[in-house]
Amino acid sequence: MPQLNPNPWFFIMIMSWAVFLLLIQPKLLSFTHTNLPSNKPLSTPNPTPWTWPWT
């Protein structure tokens, strides 16, 4: 059963995780968010009921 031989795919998996953790992740974490969270209280809108013309 060739899938039990970890020789070809284990190295590829380790290298792909190393690239993700060392190169891609710091670049993604350095981005700033455009909308920072605020402490405003959440207000629920009070919608007016729709008047249907055919009722």
Swiss-Prot record:
The chain crosses the membrane at residues 9-29. It is found in: Mitochondrion membrane. It is a single-pass membrane protein. Pfam families: ATP-synt_8 (PF00895). One of its GO terms (molecular function) is proton transmembrane transporter activity. One of its GO terms (biological process) is proton motive force-driven ATP synthesis. GO terms for cellular component: mitochondrial membrane; proton-transporting ATP synthase complex. InterPro entries: ATP8_metazoa, ATPase_protein_8. Keywords: ATP synthesis, CF(0), Hydrogen ion transport, Ion transport, Membrane, Mitochondrion, Transmembrane, Transmembrane helix, Transport. Belongs to the ATPase protein 8 family. Component of the ATP synthase complex composed at least of ATP5F1A/subunit alpha, ATP5F1B/subunit beta, ATP5MC1/subunit c (homooctomer), MT-ATP6/subunit a, MT-ATP8/subunit 8, ATP5ME/subunit e, ATP5MF/subunit f, ATP5MG/subunit g, ATP5MK/subunit k, ATP5MJ/subunit j, ATP5F1C/subunit gamma, ATP5F1D/subunit delta, ATP5F1E/subunit epsilon, ATP5PF/subunit F6, ATP5PB/subunit b, ATP5PD/subunit d, ATP5PO/subunit OSCP. Subunit 8, of the mitochondrial membrane ATP synthase complex (F(1)F(0) ATP synthase or Complex V) that produces ATP from ADP in the presence of a proton gradient across the membrane which is generated by electron transport complexes of the respiratory chain. ATP synthase complex consist of a soluble F(1) head domain - the catalytic core - and a membrane F(1) domain - the membrane proton channel. These two domains are linked by a central stalk rotating inside the F(1) region and a stationary peripheral stalk. This is ATP synthase F(0) complex subunit 8. It comes from Rhea americana. The gene is MT-ATP8.
